[in-house]
Curated annotation (Swiss-Prot):
Gene: gltX2
Keywords from the named record: Aminoacyl-tRNA synthetase, ATP-binding, Cytoplasm, Ligase, Nucleotide-binding, Protein biosynthesis
UniProt name for this protein: Glutamate--tRNA ligase 2
Binding positions (ATP): K242
Top EC class, one word: ligase
Cellular component annotations (GO), alphabetically ordered: cytosol
Source organism (scientific name): Rickettsia felis (strain ATCC VR-1525 / URRWXCal2) (Rickettsia azadi)
Length: 463
């Protein structure tokens, strides 16, 4: 295969969408698999909607996922002179023309076609007019002169050959009246100028492909290989939207997902390698090919995503888990070295109850001795309705323990339960609520051993 060059070309109008992240991943893996280049282009020609914040979100999202691009980032907003020269070249070669038709007239024709239940294709009266007839008081657009006869074939590696009759393609605008390029022209000029060999993108771009190929043909450029992948859908099979949950990569980071886990999950959304579920980035680069892409839309499954993330969490060592957990906690708490040591000691038992870093951080709050406990509503109700005399017995019993380890603590609770004719859980339920603020947590006996007698008694005495 020739030197492979792929590109990821997002519009900076919001966050880095989870579907866009998958597109970037596929382009990255394909380029790396073939020892090629993965380029980044920011399609910011829409000045009203493009923002610096969105550009930064794209950069940070890609870096967090580990999708490092090659070379300098291309900004379309800085390349309009290149697009203008390209449009004028087609004009000089008779492959484009000035059009003076107003938007109002085009809209009138569209409405007429709609009323007659006809498919609307704008046919400009200026297509073959002599320049001597041009009005001098109207700024024209430049339109592509699409051949009236024949057809365009999209040779898609996934969808197969898609044939579009030229009669169904309008003479699209290349250069607006204000001299700025349209998306269609800019994309083709950039892909050619950047040497793009393979275009991998969502199948929502399939309708654009025929129009872009018409521009490629007009310039005499070689058309890159095209692969249009099905979009990601929600669990209900509908197109992914806000009601399905988080859409931006940054949101998944904030929810405590690991980048390695998210890449693995996105990779399996529409691509497979036998029955392999756990695929490292190294393996993905080695195995990735376009032949294994699926033709049907993939459904976002948070249960599977959580399960996969839990697996990747368990691959991290104790120090790394502690560091990542403390980093999250520091967003809201001032953490002492003593508290860090508690969390590190407790990490194995926290990990078995967690699927995300956020789960870990929530449980790790138990060990923040310098911060007030956050009580769940159910825990509050348990505390309010518990036997206060029983808790006093617990305080007295624990205070008598000399070697405050989990075995001694457990034996003391059993002793108190037997003395009162209770089951062990009858005591542990309110004690857990008081010590952790939760109704479900790691072993209270282990928590007691890690925090020590003084901290445990302090929490029990608030009642």
């Amino acid at each position: 295969m020739t030197n492979v060059i792929t590109r990821f070309a997002p519009s900076p109008t919001g966050f880095l969408h989870i579907g866009s992240a998958r597109t970037a991943l596929f382009n990255y893996l394909f380029a790396r698999h073939h020892n090629g280049k993965f380029l980044l282009r920011i399609e910011d020609t829409d000045k009203e909607r493009s923002t610096k914040e969105a550009v930064e979100a794209i950069f940070s999202g890609l870096k967090w996922l580990g999708l490092d691009w090659d070379g300098e980032v291309i900004f379309q907003s800085k390349r309009n002179n290149l697009y203008k020269e390209a449009a004028l070249r087609l004009l000089q070669e008779g492959k484009a023309y000035y059009c003076f038709t107003s938007q109002e007239e085009i809209e009138r024709q569209r409405q007429k076609a709609l009323e007659n239940k006809q498919h609307f294709i704008f046919n400009s009266e200026w297509r073959d007019k002599d320049s001597s007839t041009y009005p001098t008081d109207i700024k024209p657009v430049i339109r592509l002169k699409v051949p009236r006869e024949g057809s365009i074939t999209i040779h898609d590696t996934l969808q197969g050959d898609v044939v579009i009759e030229n009669s169904h393609i309008d003479d699209m605008v290349l250069l607006r009246a204000d001299g700025t390029a349209t998306y269609m022209l800019a994309v083709v000029v950039d892909d050619h100028d950047m040497g793009i060999t393979h275009i991998i993108r969502g199948d929502d771009h399939l309708t654009n492909a025929a129009r872009q190929i018409a521009i490629y043909h007009a310039f005499g450029y070689e058309v890159p290989s095209m692969t249009h992948i099905p979009l990601i859908h929600g669990a209900d099979g509908a197109k992914l939207s806000k009601r399905h949950g988080a859409l931006g990569v940054e949101a998944y980071k904030d929810m405590g997902y690991l980048p390695e886990s998210l890449c693995n999950y996105l990779l399996r959304l529409g691509w497979s390698h036998g029955d392999d579920e756990i695929i490292s980035m190294t393996q993905a680069i080695e195995w990735f090919n376009l032949d294994s892409l699926g033709k049907s839309p993939s459904k976002l499954d948070f249960a599977k995503m959580n399960s996969l993330n839990a697996h990747y969490l368990r691959m991290l060592d104790n120090d790394s888990l502690t560091s990542k957990t403390v980093e999250i906690l520091k967003q809201n708490y001032k953490i002492s070295e003593k508290e860090v040591s508690y969390i590190k000691q407790a990490m194995p038992s926290l990990l078995v109850r967690s699927e995300t870093l956020l789960d870990l951080a929530k449980l790790a709050r138990i060990y923040l001795i310098n911060s007030p406990i956050i009580y769940e509503q159910e825990a509050k109700e348990i505390i309010e309705n518990c036997d206060k005399d029983l808790i006093k017995q617990v305080i007295e019993g624990l205070n008598k323990i000399e070697q405050f380890d989990k075995e001694s603590v457990q034996n003391k609770f059993k002793e108190i339960a037997t003395h009162n004719g209770l089951k062990l859980n009858d005591i542990m339920k309110p004690v857990r609520a008081l010590i952790t603020g939760m109704t479900a947590s790691p072993s209270v006996f282990e928590i007691a051993e890690i925090l020590g007698k003084e901290n445990i008694l302090k929490r029990l005495k608030i009642i």
